[in-house]
Amino acid sequence: MPHHILCAVYGLMPSISVVTCRVLGMLNWKNYGSDFDTKYWLVKDACGLFTCSITNFFIFGGAYVTNVYGLKEKSTMNMIHSVIVCTLLFLGAISQWQCMLTDPGAVPLDAVPLKAAAATSNTCNRCGTFKPSRAHHDRVSKRCVVKMDHFCPWVNNCVGFYNHKFFILFLVYVFLGS
């Protein structure tokens, strides 16, 4: 059933209705993308989504191997090691998802330069929007990104101004957990 019908059905209980509508709205694939009119950020690149899935497989596979084979000998040190590694890998997976689902700093369609910088304003040749200084066009998401570092296929997103922290945390947690 479409989520607006469920919202009408649960109209008598507003708190359940709001939660149900939000969850079902978030599960709708049409709400995700890197276009100007999407509600939630997600780069819909098949290769990137596959690579991101492989990354999750290795993270959770590492946690599984640590728990199954690391705890064959029952000792306190093995238990502590397993808890630390699984915690770090879980935090790495959370950081990966935050990096993947966070807008990296894409320039909005209606962005205009400041009055002081209007004389030297640039326009992107590929997407036609205002291009601030230190912004670069990302070929995969087809958007200009402020302080773009690179496109990372392991998180299926461009690393930019708003998700740089999550990317560094992802690297640190996976490095320490491996």
Feature-to-residue mapping (PLM):
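Intracellular leaflet-associated regions of eukaryotic membrane-associated proteins
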Residues: M1-S178
